[in-house]
Amino acid sequence: MTNLRKTHPLMKIINSSFIDLPAPSNISSWWNFGSLLGVCLIVQILTGLFLAMHYTSDTMTAFSSVTHICRDVNYGWLIRYLHANGASMFFICLFLHVGRGLYYGSYMFLETWNIGVLLLFAVMATAFMGYVLPWGQMSFWGATVITNLLSAIPYIGSDLVEWIWGGFSVDKATLTRFFAFHFILPFIIAALAGVHLLFLHETGSNNPSGLCSDADKIPFHPYYTIKDILGVLLLILVLTSLVLFAPDLLGDPDNYTPANPLNTPPHIKPEWYFLFAYAILRSIPNKLGGVLALVLSILVLAVIPFLHTSKQRSMMFRPFSQCLFWILVADLLTLTWIGGQPVEHPFIIIGQLASILYFLLILVLMPITSLFENNLLKW
C-alpha cells in the first residue's frame, strides 16, 4: 500500500512542500529565516486575534481598552507584548531574509523575489496601521504625519488624504478602518506567502555557492525540519526574553500618553523598523521628492535583478561586492540611527549623505563592481 502522504490530495501538497522536498545539501542557517517568518506570522495572527476580542476601535475607548487588556484580562499583558515585540522580531527576520537574498543572488528567481517585495510592502502597511491602534500620542501623530504625505501627490493628493481619513482629520473613522485593514491584511500576507513558496518550489532553493545543486539534493525532512526547529526555539527564546524582561525596550514612551490633537510630541518618529525609510524621507527638503524617495527606498529592491551584471550568482566568491554589501548594511544602520534623531545639525547632513550612498550603492556601485570582477577573472 502506498504511503497516505503521497496519495491523499491534501497531504500530497504538504508532502511535496515540507517532507520529500529536494533541498540543496549545503544551505546555511541564513536559509532558516523563511520558516521563522512563517512562525512570526502565526504568532502575530493568534495574539492579534485574542487582542481583537478585547480591543475597541473607538477614539474614546481605544486607549483604555488596551490598558484594560494589560490590567484585567488573564495574561493580557503577555498577549499584548508578544504581539508588539513579535512585530519587531518579524522585521528583524524580514531584513535578514532580504539581506540573505541580496548576498547570495536569490533575487534571480524573479517571481519569488517580486512576490517577496510585495510581501514586504504588505507587512510594512500592516505594521503601520497596527501602530495607530493603541491611540497613544505617537499613534495619532504618526498616523497624521504619514497619511499627510499622500497630499504631495499632484491634483488628487488632498482629496485622497481626506478619503483615507474619512473626514478632515485623523479621527474615529480613520481608527475604525485602520483596525479593519490591520485585521484582514495578515490573512492576505499568509496567502501571498503561499504564492511565494509556490514559485520557490518551481525552481528549488538557491544555495550559498550560487551554483546548480541538482546533482546533490537531500530530503527536507528530517534534515531541514530539525534545523528549522532549532531556529524556531532560538526565536522563541529571544522573543520571550524581550517580552518578559524588557517589553518596552523597542517602543516609544510617548505612546503611553493618550492621543491629544492639541499637543504635538517634540519628536514624531515611527517604530524602529521604519526609521531607515523615515530618514530617507526627511533627507529631501521637497515634500513630493521625499515621498518618492521613501517609496523608492523599498521599490528599488524590485530593480536589483535587472542590475545583476556579474557572471556569478552569489557574492560568496566576490570580495569587492562583499565589501559594498557590508557598506550597505552599515549605511542602513546609520539611516536607522538618523531616523530617530531630531532634525538638526549634524544629523541632517549625515542623513542626506547616507541616503545618497544607499541609492548610489544599489543602482551604480554594485553593478559596476560586478563588471570589474568579471574583468579580473577575464570573463
Curated annotation (Swiss-Prot):
Entry binding sites for heme b b566: 97, 196
Protein location: Mitochondrion inner membrane
Disulfide cross-links: none
Identification of the protein by name: Cytochrome b
Keyword Signal: no
Any GO CC annotation of this UniProt entry: respiratory chain complex III
Description of how the protein assembles with itself and partners: The cytochrome bc1 complex contains 11 subunits: 3 respiratory subunits (MT-CYB, CYC1 and UQCRFS1), 2 core proteins (UQCRC1 and UQCRC2) and 6 low-molecular weight proteins (UQCRH/QCR6, UQCRB/QCR7, UQCRQ/QCR8, UQCR10/QCR9, UQCR11/QCR10 and a cleavage product of UQCRFS1). This cytochrome bc1 complex then forms a dimer.
Cofactor, free-text remark: Binds 2 heme b groups non-covalently.
GO biological process: mitochondrial electron transport, ubiquinol to cytochrome c
Primary localization class, coarse: mitochondrion
Entry's transmembrane regions: 33-53, 77-98, 113-133, 178-198, 226-246, 288-308, 320-340, 347-367
Record's bilayer topology term: Multi-pass membrane protein
PROSITE patterns linked to this entry: CYTB_CTER, CYTB_NTER
Entry cofactors: heme b
Gene that encodes it: MT-CYB
Species name: Sorex vagrans
One example GO MF annotation: metal ion binding
Keywords in alphabetical order: Electron transport, Heme, Iron, Membrane, Metal-binding, Mitochondrion, Mitochondrion inner membrane, Respiratory chain, Transmembrane, Transmembrane helix, Transport, Ubiquinone
